């Protein structure tokens, strides 16, 4: 691990949650010292999978980018912790048991033991570009994970496809599962998929204990929530 690196952050957003991204999420990251925060807004409504792959294809250079969703809350030292992981390849910053993650598999792990959740993940830009190409030309036909028979034509899963890409193309490598988690999933506060018919539970981080930060956010966004999927 190294310190002092410039942290690149890409927020994956939908138009209905841009109020949270622009008023809270992006400014909060900048207040922590983030110098390179981009927003990838799915203005055409292509869905999380296609929008994600397009953002992967657009990555440049050979560093890494932290990809975060528009319904997360970063920890108080998020940017500093990201700097500490800047030489660690793929880093998963969020774990959720309801999303089939094993919270006990933390630290440096084999690709097969990586967490699944895509709320916060550092991806080398070279991997992102390669994954986008893999998805476009080979990934759909070669998909073997059981979930994909459900995903085709139904729910989209950028996290599932990226995990399969790692398992097929980088199976002998290791990734990092960051404990404590770097973000909390707050769709139940800012509006999101918590009330969607397919999920009726709170998908919260397994390793998060800053409830004061959660309460502060709830108070700050009171009366501002505009969207529930």
Where are the regions a protein language model picked out?
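Peripheral/terminal regions associated with large enzymatic or DNA-binding modules
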Residues: 2-68, 72-229
């Amino acid at each position: 691990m190294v310190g002092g690196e410039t942290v690149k952050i890409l927020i994956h957003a939908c138009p209905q949650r841009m109020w949270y991204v622009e008023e809270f999420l992006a400014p909060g990251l900048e207040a922590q010292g983030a110098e390179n925060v981009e927003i990838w807004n799915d203005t055409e409504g292509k869905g999380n999978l296609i929008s994600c792959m397009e953002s992967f294809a657009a990555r440049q250079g050979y560093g890494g980018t932290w990809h975060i969703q528009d319904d997360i809350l970063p920890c108080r030292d998020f940017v500093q912790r990201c700097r500490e992981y800047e030489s660690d390849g793929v880093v998963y910053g969020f774990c959720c048991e309801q999303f089939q993650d094993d919270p006990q598999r933390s630290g440096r792990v084999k690709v097969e033991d990586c967490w699944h959740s895509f709320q916060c993940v550092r991806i080398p830009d070279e991997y992102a570009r390669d994954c986008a190409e893999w998805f476009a030309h080979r990934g759909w036909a070669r998909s073997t994970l059981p979930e994909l028979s459900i995903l085709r034509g139904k729910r989209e899963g950028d996290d599932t496809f990226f995990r399969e890409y790692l398992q097929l193309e980088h199976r002998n490598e290791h990734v990092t599962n960051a404990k404590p988690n770097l973000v909390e999933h707050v769709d139940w506060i800012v509006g999101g998929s918590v009330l969607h018919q397919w999920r009726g539970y709170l998908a919260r981080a397994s390793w998060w204990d800053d409830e004061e930060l959660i309460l502060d956010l709830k108070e700050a966004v009171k009366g501002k929530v505009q969207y529930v999927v």
